[in-house]
């Protein structure tokens, strides 16, 4: 039997928004001292969150868990206007680690709200990004309504108030194919519906989904490194399975079941946008222990995007 090899997806792992969010927490701790409070997990990865806890970050779900006069960081997923207003009312020092591509969606929702349009948000109920985006809507600013649609079946039962004054936005980490199907169904039902000037699904989500499909065409098993609460990581594993390949989402190398690789010749390996390279390296080491002989990296879409840090943290680092 030929030796088992490993194919690495490209790109994989951290995106620009995740890099920025983690760096904001690290620099805030370095420059202001611990503890620094973070509302929600700054990114959805257990390893990253545990590392930041050891450095002095305290993760909370609501601002009432943050003491007066403390510093709080908003996670990469974004927050509602109500959360921002509460932080301002209490005089908390805030650093905003919201991904700029999520902020773009927030601006779209606020713009439609001011214009009095109805808005359909395509996303997963309960996800913090969706909660933050829904929370950009204010009835005080406009006469429209915001609706959440999770799947194509819900389009058939959707009943908007203003079908001729309607727009849509999306969560940034969705399956590209599923989202396009929902948008097509919405357009068929509401032909006058407006869309964003540019796709709301972020470049990193698109690139990693394209890369995992490239893997699936060449492998008989795909492992995705990412935490169970990571939306984009879950989508990667789903896509591989949808393309007919056995796939598992794992937090780290310890979760690999040796039975998975029995009889497999080509193992594909990728990582969600919130999973660090050190976890990928650990999985590679474990696969070598289990008999993997060679490792190669597929060609993929180059990524060079960098998002600026908050000005105060940049200045503090220089000084």
Swiss-Prot record:
It comes from the Bacteria. (2E)-4-hydroxy-3-methylbut-2-enyl diphosphate binds at residues 44, 77, 127, 172, 230-232, 274. The active site is at residue 129. InterPro entries: LytB/IspH. Pathway: Isoprenoid biosynthesis; dimethylallyl diphosphate biosynthesis; dimethylallyl diphosphate from (2E)-4-hydroxy-3-methylbutenyl diphosphate: step 1/1; Isoprenoid biosynthesis; isopentenyl diphosphate biosynthesis via DXP pathway; isopentenyl diphosphate from 1-deoxy-D-xylulose 5-phosphate: step 6/6. It is an enzyme of class 1 (oxidoreductase). [4Fe-4S] cluster binds at residues 15, 99, 202. Isopentenyl diphosphate binds at residues 44, 77, 127, 230-232, 274. It catalyses: isopentenyl diphosphate + 2 oxidized [2Fe-2S]-[ferredoxin] + H2O = (2E)-4-hydroxy-3-methylbut-2-enyl diphosphate + 2 reduced [2Fe-2S]-[ferredoxin] + 2 H(+); dimethylallyl diphosphate + 2 oxidized [2Fe-2S]-[ferredoxin] + H2O = (2E)-4-hydroxy-3-methylbut-2-enyl diphosphate + 2 reduced [2Fe-2S]-[ferredoxin] + 2 H(+). One of its GO terms (molecular function) is 4-hydroxy-3-methylbut-2-enyl diphosphate reductase activity. GO terms for biological process: dimethylallyl diphosphate biosynthetic process; isopentenyl diphosphate biosynthetic process, methylerythritol 4-phosphate pathway; terpenoid biosynthetic process. Its cofactor is [4Fe-4S] cluster. Its EC number is 1.17.7.4. Keywords: 4Fe-4S, Iron, Iron-sulfur, Isoprene biosynthesis, Metal-binding, Oxidoreductase. Dimethylallyl diphosphate binds at residues 44, 77, 127, 230-232, 274. Binds 1 [4Fe-4S] cluster per subunit. Pfam families: LYTB. The keyword Signal does not apply. Catalyzes the conversion of 1-hydroxy-2-methyl-2-(E)-butenyl 4-diphosphate (HMBPP) into a mixture of isopentenyl diphosphate (IPP) and dimethylallyl diphosphate (DMAPP). Acts in the terminal step of the DOXP/MEP pathway for isoprenoid precursor biosynthesis. Belongs to the IspH family. This is 4-hydroxy-3-methylbut-2-enyl diphosphate reductase. The gene is ispH.
